[in-house]
Amino acid sequence: MLEIKLSDVSKIISAKLYGDKNFIIKGISSIEDSKPGYISFIYKNKFRKYLPSCKASAIILAKDNLPFCKQFALVVKDPYIAYVKLVKFMYVKKIPKYRIRSTAIVSKKAILGKNIYIGHNTVIESKVKLENNIIIGSGCFIGENTIIGSNTHLWDNTTIHHGTIIGNNCSIQSGSVIGSDGFGYANKNGSWIKIPHLGKVVIGNNVEIGSSTTIDRGSIDNTVIGNGVIIDNQCQIAHNVIIGENTAIAGGVVMAGSLIIGSNCIIGGASVINGHIIICDRVKITGMSMVMRSIKTPGIYSSGVPAQLNKKWKKNTALIMNINKIKKQIKEILKKYKKK
């Protein structure tokens, strides 16, 4: 972590500074748990209530919150983006010294670029191609004929199966498995016959994948993750799924096979999406939704029942279970009314 003058902070985040330009900032704290000597930020007006009790020495905020700020202030158009810029500058990522650790097993037929770190107990199989500036943590497995682009980081205990293609500037967190066989079986006389999966997983540039996420290889064609996609922890992406550029997928999402999702979509946590359907660009699906049919129009889509008092939930569920009976009763009442 770097210590930095407020004048330098204002330059980094393109802010107008109100306060002592020579004041030294020691770090970044949240507005709720602020500390003297630290800088905090407000990106929504609902956090304005914390300003009177805030102990931070400086605040990043929008112009409309400036009258409520008694601390040194840095006014920007978008406080959240400004905060991200500052974090990236102040908290420098520690890069291990480039080397291959003694317990790593690297095939002689693997092709390694410049500045490669390979951690303990990692296995790199034949004909793997690693570009430049790659970090591979301990306990990883990279199957044969895999290609990994420059500036990509595989965290500890990541598994990349054969033939996978990963682009530049990607990050795959611990426990994730890329390129397993998909859930493909044929039923013959009541018995299941496994279908070999011949496709690959192809991941674009600037993709981030969280921990314990699984992405299956395609059955014939490839499973494709577009440029700039971000995927949270514990997501299941089945065979032949195609995800468009800059789509964000929150934790616990389950996607069935041959689903196509457009670009710039947001999929809320724990949503379940049917296979063999198409979701167009710029769709937002709220958390815990179940999507059964294609979505052809951009917008916000929801399903499911939010939590409520148990008594109320039981009554509402009883009404839903009896909806057809209630419908018939209403029809009978309307018939009698019309006769009058």
Curated annotation (Swiss-Prot):
NCBIfam families according to UniProt: lipid_A_lpxD, PRK00892.1
One Gene Ontology MF term: N-acyltransferase activity
Subunit structure: Homotrimer.
Family: Belongs to the transferase hexapeptide repeat family. LpxD subfamily.
Pfam family, one: Hexapep
Pathway noted in the entry: Glycolipid biosynthesis; lipid IV(A) biosynthesis; lipid IV(A) from (3R)-3-hydroxytetradecanoyl-[acyl-carrier-protein] and UDP-N-acetyl-alpha-D-glucosamine: step 3/6
Keywords: Acyltransferase, Lipid A biosynthesis, Lipid biosynthesis, Lipid metabolism, Repeat, Transferase
PROSITE patterns membership: HEXAPEP_TRANSFERASES (PS00101)
Catalytic reaction(s) noted: a UDP-3-O-[(3R)-3-hydroxyacyl]-alpha-D-glucosamine + a (3R)-hydroxyacyl-[ACP] = a UDP-2-N,3-O-bis[(3R)-3-hydroxyacyl]-alpha-D-glucosamine + holo-[ACP] + H(+); UDP-3-O-[(3R)-3-hydroxytetradecanoyl]-alpha-D-glucosamine + (3R)-hydroxytetradecanoyl-[ACP] = UDP-2-N,3-O-bis[(3R)-3-hydroxytetradecanoyl]-alpha-D-glucosamine + holo-[ACP] + H(+)
GO biological process: lipid A biosynthetic process
EC number assigned by the record: 2.3.1.191
Disulphide linkage map: none
Active site: 239
Gene this protein is translated from: lpxD
Top-level taxon of origin: Bacteria
Keyword flag Cell membrane: no
This protein's name: UDP-3-O-(3-hydroxymyristoyl)glucosamine N-acyltransferase
UniProt keyword annotation of Lipid metabolism present: yes
CC annotations in GO: membrane
UniProt-listed SUPFAM superfamilies: Trimeric LpxA-like enzymes (SSF51161)
Function: Catalyzes the N-acylation of UDP-3-O-(hydroxytetradecanoyl)glucosamine using 3-hydroxytetradecanoyl-ACP as the acyl donor. Is involved in the biosynthesis of lipid A, a phosphorylated glycolipid that anchors the lipopolysaccharide to the outer membrane of the cell.
